[in-house]
């Protein structure tokens, strides 16, 4: 009879089949040699069988008198769930459906149905109940103990007459849900550290910034939510600021050239490094002068330092957001706009042309031979004619003729400056 399994060779050179017992002929030979007084070590060398196998076979023969191999597959299972025990377990569960497995196990021991050594385990009782259809929960013993304690507490509270009969079938009712006001500890970090709604600006830029309505401090909580627009801890809205601080970015970009122009216009002393920022009084005076003069003049020319103003030089209007602090003109007259502005200028206003040139301006950079702007004659004629027509309408017109003593590059620069004034205005 061929044996199926993994064949191998032991240390003595004998062939064996792993997991299968020795043939009966080999077993009989081992027992016969042992009865003749041969030592087990000599038997193993003679029959090419390992010493452990010889010892095991001889030990079983001396104990039982049999040479048959033992059972394969481990120890024999203990049969504790007899039909009598199974019927008793099912009867106890039918009598009391709320009884747990550990209670059934105690009842089996108290009623002398099972001995302490043969009583089935809790898992065996649960398996019996599950197979019989009386147990559907997959609870462990610890969960059953916790549920039993909760059920006992609920029954004690019910018997004490704490309240009317509830509809939970003898089980503990769920704890009452109390809605507490939100606290900073319970609030998510995103909502807790979110900015107030007054400071949230539209990232897409579809709507302009509008002043938020002021809210009384009593309506604010200790924290602000991003979802509630009516809650704000502090009044940080744009309505608390002045209009000129909101819509005049030139007040924020107050450069050294503006301070120098202000000092020259008011006759005060100019300190180049003394004032690192604009004082509030000077900014307010500049804002009031801009509202009194009725507007600003935008051009790409340099700063005019010759014309003094009554309340200070005017700042350029930056509502459109297209002009930068480097391209601002502070040309202001006593009661009107700049000379290149339009026919609304008063006839008595005079404007001189002493300008402080910026070495980094476009005009100065265009003076270099490699970067000089080349204009064709047709475009130059068109610009000259348009500037002449507009300057004839104005009472005060800057001269467009180039004197003989001026350099052609300076004449071209003057022409470009006047053209830029006309185009911007």
Curated annotation (Swiss-Prot):
The protein's name: Paired box pox-neuro protein
Keywords from the named record: Developmental protein, Differentiation, DNA-binding, Neurogenesis, Nucleus, Paired box, Transcription, Transcription regulation
Tissue expression as described in the entry: Central and peripheral nervous systems.
BP terms from Gene Ontology: adult feeding behavior; antennal morphogenesis; cell differentiation; imaginal disc-derived leg morphogenesis; imaginal disc-derived wing morphogenesis; male courtship behavior; nervous system development; regulation of transcription by RNA polymerase II
GN (gene name): Poxn
Compositionally biased tracts (Pro residues): 172-185
Record field: compositional bias (Low complexity): 323-332, 340-349
Coiled coil: none
PROSITE patterns noted in UniProt: PAIRED_1, PAIRED_2
Highest taxon of source: Eukaryota
Region (RED subdomain): 84-132
Region annotation (PAI subdomain) ranges: 8-64
Amino acid composition bias (Acidic residues), ranges on this chain: 402-425
GO cellular component term, pick one: nucleus
Job of this protein: Transcriptional regulator that specifies poly-innervated organs (chemosensory bristle). Also controls the number of neurons.
Lineage: Eukaryota, Metazoa, Ecdysozoa, Arthropoda, Hexapoda
DNA-binding region location: 5-132
């Amino acid at each position: 009879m061929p044996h199926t399994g993994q064949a191998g060779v032991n240390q003595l050179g004998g062939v064996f089949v792993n997991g299968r017992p020795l043939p009966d002929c080999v077993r009989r030979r081992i027992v016969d040699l042992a009865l003749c007084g041969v030592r087990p070590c000599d038997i193993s060398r003679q029959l090419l069988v390992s010493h452990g196998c010889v010892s095991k076979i001889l030990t079983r023969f001396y104990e039982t008198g049999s040479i048959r191999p033992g059972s394969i597959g481990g120890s024999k299972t203990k049969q504790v769930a007899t039909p009598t025990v199974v019927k008793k377990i099912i009867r106890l569960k039918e009598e009391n459906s709320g009884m747990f497995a550990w209670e059934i196990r105690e009842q089996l021991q108290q009623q002398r149905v099972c001995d302490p050594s043969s009583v089935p385990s809790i898992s065996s009782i649960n398996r019996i109940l599950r197979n019989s259809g009386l147990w559907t929960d997959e609870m462990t013993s610890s969960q059953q103990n916790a549920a039993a304690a909760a059920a006992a507490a609920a029954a004690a509270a019910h018997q004490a007459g704490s309240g009317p009969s509830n509809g939970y079938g003898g089980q503990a009712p769920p704890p009452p849900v109390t809605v507490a006001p939100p606290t900073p500890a319970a609030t998510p970090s995103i909502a807790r550290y979110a900015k107030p709604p007054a400071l949230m600006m539209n990232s897409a830029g579809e709507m302009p910034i509008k002043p938020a309505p002021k809210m009384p401090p009593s309506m604010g909580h200790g924290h602000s939510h991003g979802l509630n627009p009516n809650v704000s801890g502090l009044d940080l809205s744009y309505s608390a600021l002045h209009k000129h601080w909101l819509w005049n970015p030139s007040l924020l970009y107050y450069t050294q050239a503006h301070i120098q122009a202000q000092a020259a216009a008011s006759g005060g002393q100019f300190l180049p490094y003394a004032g690192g920022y604009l004082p509030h009084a000077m900014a307010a005076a500049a804002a009031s002068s801009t509202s009194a003069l009725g507007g600003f003049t935008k051009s790409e020319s340099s700063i005019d330092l010759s014309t003094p103003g009554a309340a200070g030089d005017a700042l350029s209007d930056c509502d459109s957001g297209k002009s930068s602090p480097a391209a601002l003109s502070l040309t202001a007259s006593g009661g009107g706009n700049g000379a290149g502005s339009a026919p609304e200028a008063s006839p008595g206003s005079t404007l001189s042309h002493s300008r402080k040139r910026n070495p980094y301006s476009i005009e100065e950079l265009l003076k270099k031979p490699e970067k000089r702007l080349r204009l064709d004659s047709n475009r130059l004629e068109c610009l000259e004619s348009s500037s002449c027509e507009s300057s004839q309408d104005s009472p005060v017109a800057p001269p467009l003729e180039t004197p003989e003593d001026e350099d052609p590059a300076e004449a071209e620069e003057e022409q470009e400056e006047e053209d830029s004034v006309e185009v911007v205005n």
